[in-house]
Structures are given as C-alpha cells and as structure tokens.
C-alpha cells in the first residue's frame, strides 16, 4: 500500500549504527531493551524539551557487575549539569534506583543545533505550544536550517492548525529530500505539541547529502557524534569533533 517507513530505521546497518550498544544472550535481550526504554523515558522527563538531541547507552561488564555508560548530546550543557553538577548527579541517582546498576553519564555540547532534526522538531513544538502562528514557525525553522549548510529539509505538521474545527495536514519543503535513497544521510524526528485545541504532530526530515563509497555518515554532517563511526580511524573508536562538541565527564 506504499506506506512510508521510518528513515532512521531504514538506514540502520547501512550508513547508521544503533544508539544502544551492547550484546547479551537471547533470554536477556527483551529485559535489557525494556530497561533502555525506561532509562530514555526518565532522562527525557527529567529535562525540558529542546535540550537533548541524542541518548546513547553502552553496557560494560567489570567482573560480575554490569556498568552502564550513557552519552548525552545537548545544546544546553548548563541545564543538563546544573550548578555544581546537581542536575546531573540527581539524574544518576534516579537511574541507579530504577535499574539497580552503576551508571556514568558523559555530556557532549552540540553547537550546530539547526542541523539536528530532533532539536528542530522540539523547538517547533515548543513555539506551537506558545500559540505562535504555525506558518511563520515553519518558515523560520527552514531558513535557519538551510543557512547551516544542509542539502534539503521537509517539515510536516498535522492537527487542528490555527485552531480550525477540522484537522488537516500541511507541509513545506526546500532543497532535495530523497527518502528512498539509502546512501542519502537522512535525519528524521517526530514531536508532539500539546495545545489548548488539541495535539499537533510535527515531523522534520533533513538531508545532509549522500554517503559515497569510502566515506561515512560523519563526512556528510559537519557535526560528529559517537553515533556515527569514523571508519578511517584505525582503532575503530568513535570520533567527536572538537569544533562542535565539548565533553564533560565530571
């Protein structure tokens, strides 16, 4: 029937890698997947919207104890850490009580916020909740994204737009957004805006260019994160661009 698939999931194993990095026996996998979901939900509820762009979970084993390392990518590192790391330590305590395991949190500061679909979608949803006119919000978001150097962007919004009695769908796009080209580096995000006249759905699709042979997704994006493996690095470790990220492990 021609239903659209999630652009992020469609590219997993091809040009993208997973945000949960661990391996275990088959019997434990469902439990650990559920545990990851609880951790992500707790983190998202702990902080306000438009702060966290990505959450990575890594599970390590030291002797018989399981150790969890969480990488947070944020545009507002001060809110995540808080004064004297109070917010960060409070989050660690909550997660350790939830899963009864030791947790370490690493924080990376994202600079190019207009190129990340999650942050763009969250910012649009926040403005819609503040009763801003949706067409002006979409045009402003697209202009800022195009100025940051992306190849194309598409934003779709559905619901009772402008408080209309009948729900409808509106979209605006500029540039090239090839959803079915697997080598195209497509960043996709969905967010909900809860307004007084109902829930509005916001979808943001950003095209960063094509991942050509002998290149990785890190070459198409000017912002690098540990989600995107740098295959040119001999030790196969993940690469963080110092120009766009600042790491805090205090």
Swiss-Prot record:
PROSITE patterns: KH_TYPE_2, RIBOSOMAL_S3. InterPro entries: KH_dom-like_a/b (IPR015946), KH_dom_type_2 (IPR004044), KH_sf_prok-type (IPR009019), Ribosomal_S3_C_sf (IPR036419), Ribosomal_uS3_bac-typ (IPR005704), Ribosomal_uS3_C (IPR001351), Ribosomal_uS3_CS (IPR018280). Transmembrane segments: none annotated. It comes from the Bacteria. One of its GO terms (cellular component) is cytosolic small ribosomal subunit. One of its GO terms (molecular function) is rRNA binding. This is Small ribosomal subunit protein uS3. The gene is rpsC.
């Amino acid at each position: 029937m021609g239903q659209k698939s999630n652009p992020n999931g469609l590219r997993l194993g091809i040009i993208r890698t997973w945000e949960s990095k661990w391996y275990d026996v088959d019997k434990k996998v469902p439990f650990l997947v559920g545990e990851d979901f609880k951790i992500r939900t707790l983190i998202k509820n702990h902080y306000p919207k438009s702060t966290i762009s990505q959450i990575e979970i890594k599970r390590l084993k030291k002797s018989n104890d399981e150790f969890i390392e969480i990488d947070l990518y944020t545009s507002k590192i001060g809110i995540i850490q808080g004064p004297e790391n109070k917010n960060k330590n409070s989050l660690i305590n909550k997660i350790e009580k939830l899963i009864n395991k030791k947790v370490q949190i690493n924080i990376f500061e994202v600079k190019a916020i207009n190129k990340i679909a999650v942050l763009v979608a969250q910012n649009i949803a926040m403005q819609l909740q503040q009763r801003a006119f949706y067409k002006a919000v979409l045009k402003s978001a697209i202009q800022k994204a195009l100025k940051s150097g992306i190849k194309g962007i598409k934003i779709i919004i559905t619901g009772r737009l402008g408080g209309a009695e009948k729900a409808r769908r509106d979209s605006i796009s500029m540039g090239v957004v090839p959803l079915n080209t697997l080598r195209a580096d497509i960043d996709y995000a969905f967010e909900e805006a809860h307004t007084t006249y109902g829930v509005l759905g916001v979808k943001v699709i950003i095209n960063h260019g094509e991942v050509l042979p002998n290149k990785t997704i890190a070459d198409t994006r000017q912002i690098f994160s540990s989600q995107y493996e740098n295959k040119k690095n001999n030790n196969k470790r993940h690469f963080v661009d110092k120009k766009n990220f600042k790491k805090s492990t205090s």
